[in-house]
Amino acid sequence: VELGIPAQAAKGEDDMTSSLDDTSHAADADATPARASVVFLFDVDNTLLDNDRVIADLRRYLVRELGAERTDQYFELFERNRAELGYADYLGALQSYRVCYPRDPHVLAVSSFLVNYPFANRLFPGSLDALEHAGRFGPTVILSDGDVVFQPRKVERSGLFDAVEKRVLIYIHKEQELEDVERRFPAQHYVLIDDKIRILTAVKQCWGRRLTTVFPRQGHYASAPEVQRYPAADLAIERIGELLDYDLPALMQAAQP
C-alpha cells in the first residue's frame, strides 16, 4: 500500500491488497507463482494518471462548496496527515475536517465528489497503450502508495484495475515492501515506471541491475528540486506514451548497476 505500521494495520493492508487481487495466484500467499522473465511495475499518480489535475479539480470544488478559507484549512489538515502517515489520504483529511466542523452540511457532498470522481477521464494519453505494450513482454502490475479506500477506488474507477488484470499492490511505503513484491510477482528482471526519482533510486539500491528504472517527466515531481539530488534513472521519457518506443531488449539493456 511508508512508515513503520503496527501489526494490525499491516494485516489490514495485506487484506486490502489481496482483495484487489483475489483472482490472481500471484497475490495468493499459499500459491507458488511461476518466476517470470520480466515484470513491469507501474506507479499510478502522475505516472499513468494526472493526479495534479485531480487535485486541482478537488480544490475548485472545495472552494465552491466550503469557501476559500475552509479549503485552505482542509489542505492544511491534509498535509499534516500526510506528514504523520507518510502517504496521501484525502478522505482522512476530510474526516479531520469534519472533527473541526461537525455541523458542516457540505462534508457528505465532498465525500461523494471524491468517491465518485471520474478518474478514467484523467488517465494520461497513452497510459493504457503503455500497459498493453508492456504486457506483450511480461505481467504488468500496479505498484502504488496510498490509503486503503481512496487509492483502490481510484485504481478501479480509472480502469487500471482491469487493464492489469487485477494485479494491484498498494502499500504505505512501497519501496520498503520489495520482499513482498518479489514474493507475489517473482521475476528475473523488473521494470519500474514511477514519477518519483526518490522511489526509483531506493528500489535500484535494492535490486541493482535486476531493475530498469523509467522516469516519466510528468506532474509536479518532474521539476522538483530533489530530482537533481538523485542519480539519473536508467531511462527518462517526457510522457508515458513514449514507453511504446522501447522494445524489451532496449529496456533490459538500459539497466545500470
Residue ranges and their predicted role:
Residues 3-4, 8, 17-35, 156-192, ...:
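Asp-based, Mg2+/Mn2+-dependent phosphohydrolase catalytic module
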Residues 54, 65-68, 78-115:
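A metal-dependent, Asp-based hydrolase signature
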Residues 41-43, 143, 192-193:
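Generic enzyme active-site microenvironment
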Residues 132-141, 145-169:
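Substrate-recognition/cap helix-loop segment adjacent to the acidic, metal-dependent catalytic center
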